[in-house]
């Protein structure tokens, strides 16, 4: 029922609309007949309602289409009019202007043509068939001809510059290709060596150091190899310097450049001083084997810690700190004073070594020989002790053992300073008797003897190293220690004849320098050395082992005896000046 009712309502509305349309059509056809006399022969009452509806709808669409098309055409025409207004003005312009307006027209058109020429050069003005515009064409042609002439000239210049650039680039490429051939540069012309700013700065620093001071410092740290300077290297003007600035390298450059004008003996002097500093204060003690040059026989162990020299006070001439000054820090006194530097005494190796260097030396020795303490200690080495001695190692640790050790050290400092004064007086006496140079034959003989007795020399080195670490508590052990000192100094100092003159009577003297003294010993050598060491020395070593058991480092007890008074230093300097 709902569907039928909806369709019925539609049909009713369509019939009503068609009835109205019929009325309108009939009215329109009657109007055409009466007014215009047109008879179309249409009778709207005969056609059904749906035909009238469809016809009217089609006519309405057609009218809408026509209206839209007309509107679009009108809009397009309006746009075209907006785009081209000057053409209409030219078309609407009067064909024959009056003669009064010619001047104004000329001015206006000349301005317009100038503007056009600026904007569009290739366009030609339109004369419009006028005879008056002839001079204007001439005026316009002149700037065009000028610009046309200028344009080809600039083009030619640009082409030439481009060609030149191309040629230069091609030449540069050819040169680069030839230089890159096989990765080798072509050797043509004179090569110039360019010095960088960094090298110039380093050279200025070297020159400044040469003018300010002319002597080496007492120690050259960081160098472990023996340096020998030949006469050819000394005569050269400059030495190659690496990129890194090492302290030792700068000292070497200073020392070598000071002896540029020297002779052959100056080369011996430089090499011997360098060898001495390296073997005494450098890192050479930590190496297993140190090769000494033949020039070391003339040099002395003059930079030994002063405390160790003070222990051997009964025989001051046997320990060769005094003989180390005979050559005055390794200097050759046969040279002229003009060849020397004025302030050569500053920073020399004969001055007392600071506590830091001696402590480092002691720690190096103890680090390389850890088994000596176990062998010489009282608790572990009872079998190696002297059976004739009265002393025995305590079974328990004493609480006040370290304090007694320090008190004995403080008491032993007072006689040491007096004995060092006596050694300085003997030093002045012995300096005049020693000769300045030795022959090569004696050196060779000493080398041969030293090779035969290298084993005894190793044991003596061991004795000296351990004796420097241990404090002296009793006066009974001093004579035997002094004998051991004399044996040690004979191995590293001048020939035996000089030492016999300066020392108190010693029965046996072992031969001098060993060619290659080894610092670190094997276990077999350490066993042999323990049997060859004097018994009293072993006795004095036992308190030291107990002190180590009480966790007291050796540097604390040793550093107290390393200090020297300024009076002793002044006396040593006076002795050097007098010689």
Swiss-Prot record:
Lumenal side, ranges: 1-48
Coiled-coil residues: none
UniProt xrefs under InterPro entries: LYRIC (IPR031402), TransReg_TumorExp (IPR052305)
Tissues where the protein occurs: In the mammary gland, expressed at the apical surface of epithelial cells lining ducts, as well as in the mammary fat pad. Not detected in the spleen, kidney, lung, or skin; minute amounts seen in the liver. Expressed in Purkinje neurons in the early postnatal and adult cerebellum. Overexpressed in mammary tumors (at protein level).
Cellular component terms per the entry's GO annotation: bicellular tight junction; endoplasmic reticulum; endoplasmic reticulum membrane; fibrillar center; nuclear body; nuclear membrane; nucleolus; perinuclear region of cytoplasm
Tree of life domain: Eukaryota
Transmembrane regions listed in the UniProt entry: 49-69
Annotated segments matching region Activation of NF-kappa-B: 1-71
Compositionally skewed regions (Basic residues) per UniProt: 159-168, 197-207, 438-448, 568-579
Positions of region (Lung-homing for mammary tumors): 378-440
Cytoplasmic side: 70-579
GO molecular function terms listed in the Swiss-Prot or TrEMBL record: double-stranded RNA binding; NF-kappaB binding; transcription coactivator activity
Segments of skewed composition (Basic and acidic residues): 108-126, 421-431, 449-470
Pfam families attached to this UniProt entry: LYRIC
Region (Interaction with BCCIP): 72-168
Function: Down-regulates SLC1A2/EAAT2 promoter activity when expressed ectopically. Activates the nuclear factor kappa-B (NF-kappa-B) transcription factor. Promotes anchorage-independent growth of immortalized melanocytes and astrocytes which is a key component in tumor cell expansion. Promotes lung metastasis and also has an effect on bone and brain metastasis, possibly by enhancing the seeding of tumor cells to the target organ endothelium. Induces chemoresistance.
Name of the protein in question: Protein LYRIC
């Amino acid at each position: 029922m709902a569907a039928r009712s909806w369709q019925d309502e539609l049909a009713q509305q369509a019939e009503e609309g068609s009835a109205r349309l019929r009325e309108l059509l009939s009215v329109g056809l009657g109007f055409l007949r009466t007014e215009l006399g047109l008879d179309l022969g249409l009778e709207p009452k005969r056609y059904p309602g749906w035909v009238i509806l469809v016809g009217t709808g089609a006519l309405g669409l057609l009218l809408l289409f026509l209206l839209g098309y007309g509107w679009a055409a009108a809009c397009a025409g309006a746009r075209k009019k907006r785009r081209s207004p000057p053409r209409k003005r030219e078309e609407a312009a009067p064909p024959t202007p009056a003669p009064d307006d010619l001047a104004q027209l000329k001015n206006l058109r000349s301005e317009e043509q100038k503007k056009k020429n600026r904007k569009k050069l290739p366009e030609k003005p339109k004369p419009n068939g006028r005879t008056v515009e002839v001079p204007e064409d001439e005026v316009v042609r002149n700037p065009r001809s000028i610009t046309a002439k200028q344009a080809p000239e600039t083009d030619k210049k640009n082409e030439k510059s481009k060609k030149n650039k191309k040629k230069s680039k091609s030449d540069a490429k050819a040169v680069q290709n030839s230089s890159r051939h096989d990765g080798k540069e072509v050797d043509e012309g004179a090569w110039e060596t360019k010095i960088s700013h960094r090298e110039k700065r380093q050279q200025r620093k070297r020159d400044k150091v040469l003018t300010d001071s002319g002597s080496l410092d007492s120690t050259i740290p960081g160098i472990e190899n023996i340096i020998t300077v030949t006469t050819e290297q000394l005569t050269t003007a400059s030495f190659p310097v690496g990129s890194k600035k090492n302290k030792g390298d700068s000292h070497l450059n200073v020392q070598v450049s000071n002896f540029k004008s020297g002779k052959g003996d100056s080369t011996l002097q430089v090499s011997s001083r360098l060898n001495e500093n390296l073997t005494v204060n450098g890192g050479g003690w930590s190496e297993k084997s140190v090769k000494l040059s033949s020039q070391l026989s003339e040099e002395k162990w003059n930079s030994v810690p002063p405390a160790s020299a003070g222990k051997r006070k009964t025989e001051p001439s046997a320990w060769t700190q005094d003989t180390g000054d005979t050559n005055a820090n390794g200097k050759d006194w046969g040279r002229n004073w003009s060849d020397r530097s004025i302030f050569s005494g500053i920073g020399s190796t004969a001055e007392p070594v600071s506590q830091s260097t001696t402590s480092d030396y002691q720690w190096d020795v103890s680090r390389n020989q850890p088994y000596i303490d176990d062998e010489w200690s009282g608790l572990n080495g009872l079998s190696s002790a002297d059976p004739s001695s009265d002393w025995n190692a305590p079974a328990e640790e004493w609480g006040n053992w370290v304090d007694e050790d320090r008190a004995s050290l403080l008491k032993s400092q007072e006689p040491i300073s007096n004995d060092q004064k006596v050694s300085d007086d003997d030093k002045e006496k012995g300096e005049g008797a020693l000769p300045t140079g030795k022959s090569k034959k004696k050196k060779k003989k000493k080398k041969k003897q030293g090779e035969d007795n290298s084993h005894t020399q190793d044991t003596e080195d061991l004795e000296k190293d351990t004796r420097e670490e241990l404090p002296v508590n009793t006066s009974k052990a001093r004579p035997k220690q002094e004998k051991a000192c004399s044996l040690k100094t004979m191995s590293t100092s001048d020939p035996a004849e000089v030492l016999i003159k300066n020392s108190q009577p010693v029965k046996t003297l072992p031969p001098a320098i060993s060619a290659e003294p080894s610092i670190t010993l094997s276990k077999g050598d350490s066993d042999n050395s323990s049997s060859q060491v004097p018994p009293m020395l072993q006795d004095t070593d036992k308190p030291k082992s107990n002190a180590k058991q009480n966790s007291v480092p050796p540097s604390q007890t040793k550093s107290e005896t390393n200090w020297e008074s300024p009076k002793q230093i002044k006396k040593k300097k006076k002795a050097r000046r007098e010689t």
